[in-house]
Amino acid sequence: MDVKAEVIEIIDELFMEDVSDMMDEDLFDAGVLDSMGTVELIVELESRFDIRVPVSEFGRDDWNTANKIVEGVTELRNA
């Protein structure tokens, strides 16, 4: 499974929201993510992709859409 598909699956599993048709929509404004959800998402991303997401890199504006999450995970996997 590619990173995009897996990120979509993780968001769906955690928040019961299919974001495949809203990849560029702000997930905070859409009510998908909040502060607690962000923590859950980071933990799951780290577990599934064997990465470490530094808190300093998980800014709301930097990881607020599914596409930005995919991009961030891809960068961390390639680091």
Swiss-Prot record:
UniProt modified residues of type O-(pantetheine 4'-phosphoryl)serine: S35
Cellular component terms per the entry's GO annotation: cytoplasm
Annotated compartments: Cytoplasm
SUPFAM superfamilies recorded: ACP-like (SSF47336)
Pathway: Cell wall biogenesis; lipoteichoic acid biosynthesis
GO molecular function: D-alanyl carrier activity
Top-level taxon in the UniProt lineage: Bacteria
Disulphide linkage map: none
Domain Carrier per the UniProt entry, residue ranges: 1-77
PROSITE patterns: CARRIER (PS50075)
Keywords: Cell wall biogenesis/degradation, Cytoplasm, Phosphopantetheine, Phosphoprotein
Biological process terms in GO annotation: cell wall organization; lipoteichoic acid biosynthetic process
Protein's job: Carrier protein involved in the D-alanylation of lipoteichoic acid (LTA). The loading of thioester-linked D-alanine onto DltC is catalyzed by D-alanine--D-alanyl carrier protein ligase DltA. The DltC-carried D-alanyl group is further transferred to cell membrane phosphatidylglycerol (PG) by forming an ester bond, probably catalyzed by DltD. D-alanylation of LTA plays an important role in modulating the properties of the cell wall in Gram-positive bacteria, influencing the net charge of the cell wall.
Homology family: Belongs to the DltC family.
Protein name: D-alanyl carrier protein
GN (gene name): dltC
